[in-house]
Amino acid sequence: MSMHGSGPSGFAPGRLNHGVVDAPQFADAADPLFDKSSLPRKASGDGILLLADGGRFEGTLFGAEGFGEGELVFTTGMMGYQESLTDPSWAGQILTFTYPLIGNYGIHGGKSESRAVWPKGVVVRHAMTDPDHRDSIGTVSELLQAHGVPGIENVDTRAITRRVRELGTVLCIFGPKEKEQEMLKRLESMTSPELDDLVDLVSIDEPVVLNPGATDDLGQPLPRIGALDCGVKYNILRNLSKRFEVVWCPPDIDMDTLNGFGIQALFCSNGPGDPAHPGKATSARHTLANAVASELPVMGIC
């Protein structure tokens, strides 16, 4: 089940089995390493962004070649673009950055929130091609190329943001300007990503203990908790691991398996899509309901 096509080692796209991550090396597993000598060709030339309501925005293509299509959303952060791009919560969406300059400090090891770029496309005012930071290992465009994710820049992101605020949910597509008619046809038949089981796409398949035998400063064992993965970010797991022995769990884990790990509480992450989707999001809700019924302490984050 692949979302963005194939990519180099370290940038495995699509559905991932994080259970293969060696727990002591967990922090290193977030490093976005890529081989610049084998990157797919960068998209270039005139592009166009089409909205389902008839909106039309011209720009310039970057990132990977191909169409970006999905639900148009925006984020207002001035920094943290690498964290946003690798946040599973954006799976299936076209992510617009309202801050006009994206990529000025490059891409860095240990700053990603997962092992993939999850948006299906990226919209920016300007994507930096010459980041200014000594620790940068690449550009935003190279990150998108490595994951097969297209981007479009030199568009009026202020106007796009105002439109999304007025319309709410809106589907869109962008790609080469000369393929506008083809994109219009694709847009007519496009369905909402809410219909897809996005939690299944971004979550792990098997449970894994991240920090077995973890102790506090006095050498006492840390409490053991389960972390229900509905699209959890690495930084959440890192911080939980400082305070607990963490069992990273798939969203459809059953209570018997959970109880077998001897957890003392259950944590539920946020994630993409509709929590009412009849897939793994519903499985996670059932797991939480069973945990509450068994009087197991439950906590979450949004």
Please provide the spans of the model-predicted regions:
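Short, Gly/Pro- and small/polar-rich lid/capping loops
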Residues: 2-4, 14, 18-63
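Flexible inter-domain linker/hinge segments
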Residues: 28, 43-44, 164, 170-224, ...
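Flexible gly/pro-rich beta->alpha loop and the following alpha-helix that scaffold active-site loops
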Residues: 233-300
